[in-house]
């Protein structure tokens, strides 16, 4: 029964994808590069995300996909969701985490907004670490209808389990750009 319900939800959620905005972007940080994609509703609804990040100082990687729900409340957008993350830290074991969290975007004008989000996967929502933490905050400027620029700060860390050390995967400021269609 669960598989049938999940299949129906997946099919119904993709029926409205044509009415959603899509975005493909890249970020270059003080310690990392990141590629990301987003399929999101204009005001309210289900959104999908995907990203891959690499810390080029020592080769640490993380990547994943996410699903969430967004609600627009005038000048603010609130969202909550869950992700499936693959981690390949330099120290410790490769593994998966299923963080849950959310975020907010506060619009100062039609072109400029501030954003912040946080996700965590405590024990039971991951397999190789004790805890996974991800935080992202910054400012975005919609330069044109199809071009967005971002400046922000991103942090991803894991707390070790069973003798595995704590480890920071990403920690630093970044500049980014995205194409929307």
Regions found by a protein language model. Give the residues of each.
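Outer-membrane beta-barrel "beta-signal"
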Residues: 139-143, 168-181
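Repeated loop/turn-to-beta-strand initiation elements of outer-membrane beta-barrel proteins
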Residues: 43-48, 73-80, 110-116, 141, ...
């Amino acid at each position: 029964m669960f598989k049938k319900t999940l299949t129906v939800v997946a099919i119904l959620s993709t029926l409205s994808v044509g009415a959603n905005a899509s975005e493909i972007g890249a970020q270059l940080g003080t310690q990392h590069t990141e590629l990301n994609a987003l399929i999101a509703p204009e005001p309210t609804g289900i959104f999908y995300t995907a990203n891959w990040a690499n810390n080029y100082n020592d080769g640490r990687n993380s990547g994943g996909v996410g699903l969430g729900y967004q609600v627009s409340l005038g000048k603010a957008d609130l969202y909550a969701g869950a992700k499936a993350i693959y981690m390949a830290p330099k120290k410790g074991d490769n593994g998966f985490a299923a963080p849950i969290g959310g975020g907010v975007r506060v619009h100062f004008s039609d072109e400029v907004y501030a954003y912040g989000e946080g996700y965590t996967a405590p024990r039971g929502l991951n397999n190789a670490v004790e805890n996974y933490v991800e935080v992202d905050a910054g400012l975005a400027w919609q330069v044109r209808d199809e071009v967005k620029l971002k400046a922000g700060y991103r942090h991803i860390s894991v707390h070790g389990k069973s003798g595995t050390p704590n480890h920071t995967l990403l920690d630093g400021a970044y500049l980014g750009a995205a194409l929307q269609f």
